[in-house]
Amino acid sequence: MEKYLIKMPIKSKASEVPKDKAVVKQGTPKIRSKVTKNDTPKELKNKENAGEDNTPKQTNGRLGRPAGKRKNLDTPETKAEKIATEEENPPKRRSSRLTRSTRSMAEDGSPSPEKEKPEKLPFIKYKGAIKYYTESQDIAASADDVLQWVEKQKDEVVPMAFDMEWPFSFQTGPGKSAVIQICVDEKCCYIYQLTNLKKLPAVLVALINHSKVRLHGVNIKNDFRKLARDFPEVSAEPLIEKCVDLGVWCNEVCETGGRWSLERLTNFIAKKAMDKSKKVRMSKWHVIPLDENQLMYAAIDVYIGQVIYRELERREKAKIINEEEFKEKNGEAAFKAMKTLGETFLSKINEVTL
């Protein structure tokens, strides 16, 4: 009887959602190979393809979700190769704009400041005379000779390099002023050791206070203050008012900034290197007699000071001439624009296009 019965499909209720039977494609499952650290990128790709199934997975009648982002399985060796390749062939920048500094370096072909190597400068070699005195009467006679030479000069200003030395101890601090060195001519330096002097000779005081003498040095004002403390017959203020600090003058002429030491100023202006030996610099300057190293050290300090003064004087005169010529050819507005751009006018500029 049952074979004559017809099975009718049962209609589902309106609220029920028909469920589709999940269809699973029959096939031979692929076994995914195990990944090891020593696998090359090609082997990793083959192993990955071997374990993939192109049929989207379905669960409970839902369509399979797309596979997630594949993990980076690059080996350390592969990563190193990629990094090296990127460093050799860096990506191009989108912007082609150049700053003013990079544009000028590109046009001039000059290397960037980061790649510039420090220039090796030759050491100073002083071959002039060194006149060294330790007794009061000898110092007075020498100072009188220099004073007479100054008065014979036709120039209104006679530059004189001035420097001092004194002993220093970390236990007791700075000692009394022991040495004064001066230079009015690059061919001769005078070194006066003050150890045996209770008072400076009057002619030496007159020399450094002479109206035509322009004393100059690096941080020279502090030297005058110390000299006045150690020898009351010296007044520091008149000397400070008329002296020239070479570091300050360099900033004005070359339009640089910061504080200068004599060594750095020598590198920058004279293009020379100084042998600032700590052994000599911290030596016993009050002990008579000074040795050859001390004498050469003291002489070079004032000799190179005179060289720097002459060079700054030359640059200042050239700068004034270049500025006046530029104003005549291009006008005041162009001159101000060039100064705003950082032009120092130490070299000649005929015309400019703005």
From Swiss-Prot:
One Gene Ontology term of the molecular function aspect: metal ion binding
Residues annotated as domain 3'-5' exonuclease: 146-314
InterPro entries from the UniProt entry: 3'-5'_exonuclease_dom, 3-5_Exonuclease_domain, RNaseH-like_sf, RNaseH_sf
Keyword Nuclease: yes
Major subcellular site: nucleus
Biased composition (Basic and acidic residues): 13-23, 36-50, 71-91
Binding positions for Mg(2+) 1 per the UniProt entry: 163, 165, 301
Annotated keywords: Exonuclease, Hydrolase, Magnesium, Metal-binding, Nuclease, Nucleus, Phosphoprotein
Top-level taxonomic group: Eukaryota
Pfam families: DNA_pol_A_exo1
GO CC terms of this entry: nucleus
Family in the record: Belongs to the WRNexo family.
Protein name as catalogued: 3'-5' exonuclease
Organism expressing this protein natively: Drosophila erecta (Fruit fly)
